[in-house]
UniProtKB/Swiss-Prot annotation:
Renumbered residue ranges of the record's region Disordered: 83-154
Pfam families xrefs: UCH
Catalytically driven reaction(s): Thiol-dependent hydrolysis of ester, thioester, amide, peptide and isopeptide bonds formed by the C-terminal Gly of ubiquitin (a 76-residue protein attached to proteins as an intracellular targeting signal)
Catalytic residues (UniProt): 399 (nucleophile), 408 (proton acceptor)
Record lineage: Eukaryota, Amoebozoa, Evosea, Eumycetozoa, Dictyostelia
Summary of subunit composition and partner proteins: Interacts with mkkA (via F-box/WD40 domains).
Protein name, per record: Ubiquitin hydrolase B
GN (gene name): ubpB
UniProt KW keywords: Hydrolase, Protease, Thiol protease, Ubl conjugation pathway
Disruption phenotype: Null cells differentiate into prestalk cells preferentially. They develop precociously and exhibit abnormal cell-type patterning with an increase in the prestalk domain and reduction in the prespore domain in the slug, and spore domain in a fruiting body. Null cells do not form the normal spherical sori seen in mature wild-type fruiting bodies. Instead, the sori remain elongated, similar to those seen in wild-type fruiting bodies that are not fully mature. The upper and lower cups of the fruiting body, which are derived from prestalk cells and anterior-like cells, are enlarged.
PANTHER family to which the protein is assigned, alphabetical: UBIQUITIN CARBOXYL-TERMINAL HYDROLASE (PTHR24006), UBIQUITIN CARBOXYL-TERMINAL HYDROLASE 10 (PTHR24006:SF687)
Length: 451
């Protein structure tokens, strides 16, 4: 359970079935994150391996995901898309409107022609490795209804008290553990949002959710691996590493390494989503000072005019920043100093966040700017520039509207088994071309490490 390498092979893909998610009360920010995680094969494998675990109810978020995916992949019937020349399940272009209300589901059965329809019709118990040709009777079946993500009501309330889904008749069998967003260990910057603004931010919710699942896995692992009385080993927990150590780099240059945060323990979540950033601080007459810290989400500034692509944003992020007016603490004189970022280690799933929102007084302003991004991305670490790790895009989350508190989220998810992109807009979804995805004003990008 602790090591993701012990789980089934990556080649054993969980077949993805498209299902819409009902917007219960301005919860489109949650829906796009749930759809994105559903499109993540590594995450699906983790949750799938929890299905036979006893007392899963002790871990509220894991239990909610297990219930959610049981419903999501249940009743393997035909998942038919309307094919009025554009293969869509909705009759309106709601994905481009700035509204937080759910789009009505006006699906009508038509003859399916897309590969994903044949795949959905061939599934058994929600799992399949190869698509098959659908029969005529299967083609005439109605699409599955959208799911009400009621399992996450308590979680949404704990994330933001201003977002309160409509009460459900089903009572949760457990109480949600309250987790303050201020205590998240993996936030690399403080948004400091005014309290009067409704903080319905998909990026914040994703980091909040991953941290919550990570903490529950720590408890689960500790419960499973209870040490014996004579076992003197340290139990699984968040442990403090040495504050500083000195390393010798290229050409004999030395540097002081500092861990700015607590070491992130090994769980399936940290193994999938967590990387490590390296901050290098250089000043005249001193050794290089390096700070390393874990991250779930890479926050990239896109405000400068020269930034028009993901590659531009990454270069700007890693560009050395000259620190003006830096004074030596011992000599009390001004010296040259600079700071730069690089990757110490890269995650299996890379989450990129384009910083589109700025907050002034009690209002949020959005930067509407098209940032190009590739379907294939290559990155390297600070210690190994020669070896490029290759990533493949599988999720694009877009925000529509001028402000964070009044906008709407949609997402595009890639289904590798059918080589098809699907656009989700709450309870509706539609097949889209890759170029349509690349033309989106993306807010979040999710890339998966290849091989």
């Amino acid at each position: 359970m602790k090591n993701i390498e012990e789980m089934p092979s990556k080649s054993q893909l969980v077949a993805h079935r498209s299902r819409g998610l009902i917007n219960t009360s301005n919860t489109c920010f949650m829906n796009v994150i749930l759809q994105s995680l559903t499109g993540c094969q590594l995450f699906l494998r983790v949750i799938k391996n929890l299905s036979d675990l006893e007392d899963l109810g002790k871990y509220p978020t894991l239990h909610s995901f297990n219930q959610f995916y049981t419903e999501y992949f249940s009743n393997p019937t035909s998942n038919i898309l309307n094919n009025n020349s554009n293969s869509t399940t909705t009759t309106s272009s709601s994905s481009t409107t700035a509204t937080t209300t759910s789009t009505s589901n006006n699906n009508k059965s038509q003859t399916p022609t897309s590969p994903i329809q044949q795949h959905h019709q061939s599934q058994t118990n929600g799992l399949s490795n190869q698509p098959s040709v659908a029969t005529q009777s299967q083609q005439q079946q109605q699409p599955q209804p959208p799911i009400n993500p009621k399992h996450f009501n308590d979680l949404v309330k704990s994330f933001n008290s201003k977002v309160s889904p409509v009460p459900q008749t089903t009572v949760s069998p457990h109480s949600m553990v309250q987790v303050s967003k201020k205590k998240l260990k993996l936030q690399l910057y403080n948004n400091s949002l005014p309290q009067t603004i409704c903080q319905q931010d998909a990026q914040e919710f994703l980091v909040f959710l991953l941290d919550l699942i990570h903490e529950e896995f720590l408890t689960l692992i500790k419960d499973i691996d209870i040490p014996k009385e004579d076992d003197k080993s340290t139990p699984t927990s968040t442990s403090i590493v040495d504050d500083n150590w000195e390393v010798v780099g290229k050409k004999g240059k030395t540097a002081i390494i500092t861990n700015s945060q607590q070491e992130l323990p090994k769980t399936p979540i940290s193994q999938i989503f967590s990387g490590v950033l390296r901050s290098s601080f250089n000043r005249t007459g001193s050794k290089e000072s390096i700070t390393v810290e874990p991250f779930y989400c890479l926050h990239l500034d896109i405000r400068p005019e020269e930034i028009n692509s993901l590659e531009d944003a990454l270069k700007f992020f890693m560009k050395p920043e000259i620190i003006e007016g830096y004074t030596c603490s011992t000599k009390k004189i001004e010296i040259s100093a600079s700071k730069s970022w690089s990757f110490e280690s890269l995650p299996r799933i890379l989450i990129v966040h384009f910083k589109r929102f700025a907050f002034e007084s009690d209002t949020s302003k959005k930067l509407d700017k098209l940032i190009r991004f590739p379907t294939q991305l290559s990155l390297s670490t600070a210690s190994n520039h020669q070896t490029q790790k290759k990533y493949s895009l599988f999720s694009v989350v877009s925000h529509h509207g001028r402000g964070l508190s009044q906008g709407h989220y949609t997402c595009d998810i890639y289904q590798p088994q059918q080589a098809q992109w699907i656009r989700y807009d709450d309870s509706t979804f539609t097949e889209v071309k890759e170029q349509d995805v690349l033309n989106r004003e993306a807010y979040l990008l999710l890339y998966q490490l290849v091989n």
